[in-house]
Amino acid sequence: MPRVKRGVTARARHKKVLDQAKGYRGRRKNVYRIAKQAVMKAGQYAYRDRRQRKRQFRALWIARINAAARELGLTYSTFMNGLKKAAVEVDRKVLADLAVFDKPAFAALAEQARAKLAA
């Protein structure tokens, strides 16, 4: 069986990791052993934060809807309950957008919710 020299594959592997570590500070960008750990940790953070981003946006939307609803004399929970009773199927992302950029439309939805809560 012939001898296998793995210099080419090792260089390619090192280059790949060091390219991924471009922009890091200190030895994390140019020392393979340290860069490899930094790239692995970055991947873990990226994986975790792709999931956290969804939670954080939902929390932001809820905070915006709550603030706008309170300006109109409703709490978030009563506002959402009223919308559900009024059969208004608008998601939180759109509601938050309306609360920030189209206050009259949000106020109209709040009135619909208030009417269904009173009935």
Swiss-Prot record:
Keyword Zinc belongs to the record: no
Any one GO CC term of the record: ribosome
Top-level taxonomy: Bacteria, Pseudomonadati, Pseudomonadota, Betaproteobacteria, Rhodocyclales
Annotated function: Binds directly to 23S ribosomal RNA and is necessary for the in vitro assembly process of the 50S ribosomal subunit. It is not involved in the protein synthesizing functions of that subunit.
GO-annotated biological processes: ribosomal large subunit assembly; translation
Keywords recorded for this protein, A-Z: Ribonucleoprotein, Ribosomal protein, RNA-binding, rRNA-binding
Matches recorded under HAMAP family: Ribosomal_bL20 (MF_00382)
GO MF, any single term: structural constituent of ribosome
Record's protein name: Large ribosomal subunit protein bL20
Family affiliation: Belongs to the bacterial ribosomal protein bL20 family.
Organism listed in the record: Azoarcus sp. (strain BH72)
This protein's encoding gene: rplT
Pfam family, one: Ribosomal_L20
Gene3D superfamilies (UniProt xref): 6.10.160.10, Ribosomal protein L20
